[in-house]
Amino acid sequence: PAPVFAEPRQGSLANGEIGAYYRSNGNAMGGNVSATFATESISIAYAGATAESDNYQAGRDFKTSPVTGREGHSLPLDEVGSTAYKSRNHELGIAFKGGAHLVEAKVGYQEIPYQLWPNQRMDMLDNGQQRLNLRYRGVFGWGTLEARAWREDVEHFMDFGADKRFWYGPDSGGPAAPNGMPCAPASAT
């Protein structure tokens, strides 16, 4: 969103918001907070949010076995595996306004320790993102000049979450795994 500034001769402006939610299915919970302080020429804003959930439950049993293929790991018959997630997002912005000129900088950070997908082969087991956005906007007699520069770094790790296994073909594990090895396609060697 665009930065907010106080009106002329208003002095300063401060506002904020806080929110939270809880959903029993999956024990999902989250919250958000935002705050802004501004004068006629400077605006400082922060926004942050967090969300997390365990696997959610279906309306009734839809599987015939609790086996996941991972030794020692099972799921209830009504639990939809690989639907858990956890995320945190933060953004801090500062803007300066003088006459017909605006300079704005925003830094953001996102952390997702895990996001599991029931319809995908692999899960995201770690994700980190940092971003920096710079913006200038100036109105001149000949027109408007707007310039932006940004940098974004993302690093993530994909692998199989606890509800998935590497091999799903014949002899791929479960209660009838050959040699007792849940991920063995054929044998221990």
Which residues are covered by each model-predicted region?
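Short polar/acidic secondary-structure junctions
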Residues: A6, R23-N25, V139
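Active-site beta-strand termini and strand-to-loop segments that position acidic
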Residues: A2-P3, F37, G138
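A beta-strand signature from Gram-negative outer-membrane beta-barrel systems
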Residues: P1-G19
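Active-site/binding-pocket entry motifs
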Residues: V4-E7, E52, E152-D153
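Outer-membrane beta-barrel domain signature, strongest for Gram-negative TonB-dependent receptors
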Residues: P76-T189
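Periplasmic-side early beta-strands and strand-to-turn transitions of outer-membrane beta-barrels
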Residues: L13-G19, R23, N27-G30, S34-N127
